[in-house]
Swiss-Prot record:
GO terms of molecular function: DNA-directed RNA polymerase activity; transcription coactivator activity
Protein name: Mediator of RNA polymerase II transcription subunit 20
Family: Belongs to the Mediator complex subunit 20 family.
GO cellular component: core mediator complex; mediator complex; nucleoplasm; nucleus
Pfam families, A to Z: Med20
Major location (coarse): nucleus
Subcellular location: Nucleus
Sorted UniProt keywords: Activator, Nucleus, Transcription, Transcription regulation
Subunit structure: Interacts with PPARG. Component of the Mediator complex, which is composed of MED1, MED4, MED6, MED7, MED8, MED9, MED10, MED11, MED12, MED13, MED13L, MED14, MED15, MED16, MED17, MED18, MED19, MED20, MED21, MED22, MED23, MED24, MED25, MED26, MED27, MED29, MED30, MED31, CCNC, CDK8 and CDC2L6/CDK11. The MED12, MED13, CCNC and CDK8 subunits form a distinct module termed the CDK8 module. Mediator containing the CDK8 module is less active than Mediator lacking this module in supporting transcriptional activation.
Length: 212
């Protein structure tokens, strides 16, 4: 894999999530991007079981268990303000056995699904983010394949993002700053998705005006 940027695309004013996704994919197709199948990234939140906290008023920590269709044999466990564990798919079974330590938060499942597009050395994924039956937002992932060091290709990624996101082009992901000259890996992408999902969850708690 290469270096990846994950961002949120605001819903266009007067349009639905699905209509905005269609506008975005149409722009990509006009640029010459070709469809390359579908993708899915999902996330379920677990919190520390009350029985493990003791009586000192400790605050429970969160853990996010995630899957990415690009890595069908792997499961990612991201600890709140901590490391990312990459395990095999049996990790989900292990979480059931660990219910005395971690418990699944109610209605915490969030996922994004959509279409993959290939444009020269760029792989683009535009997805609809859903919680339960409802569409909550739009995710955009762009990967530049030939490079594995974020600082070496961010300007190129930025230029490509501007070509179809325009004024909604994101800034450099926080994970780039943490790993400026390090080799980029799948865990870095999952951290970005975790941050995106948490941002969208928070947006559901306050009314958001349409964006032109």
């Amino acid at each position: 894999m290469g270096v990846t940027c994950v961002s949120q695309m605001p819903v266009a004013e007067g349009k639905s999530v699905q209509q905005t996704v269609e506008l975005l994919t149409r722009k990509l197709e006009m640029l010459g991007a070709e469809k390359q199948g579908t993708f899915c990234v999902d996330c379920e939140t677990y919190h520390t079981a009350a029985s493990t906290l003791g009586s000192q008023g400790q605050t429970g920590k969160l853990m996010y268990v995630m899957h990415n269709s690009e890595y069908p044999l792997s499961c990612f466990a991201l600890f709140e303000n901590g490391p990312c564990l990459i395990a095999d798919t049996n990790f989900d079974v292990l979480m059931v056995k660990l219910k005395g330590f971690f418990q699944s938060a109610k209605a915490s499942k969030i996922e994004t699904r959509g279409t993959r597009y290939q444009y020269c050395d760029f792989l683009v994924k535009v997805g609809t983010v859903t919680m339960g039956p409802s569409a909550r937002g739009i995710s955009v992932e762009v990967e530049y394949g030939p490079c594995v060091v974020a600082s070496d290709c961010w300007s190129l990624l930025l230029e490509f993002l501007q070509s179809f996101l325009g004024s909604h082009t994101p800034g450099a992901p926080a994970v780039f700053g943490n790993r400026h000259d390090a080799v980029y890996g799948p865990a870095d992408t999952m951290v970005q998705y975790m941050e995106l999902f948490n941002k969208i969850r928070k947006q559901q708690q306050v009314p958001v005006a349409g964006i032109r």
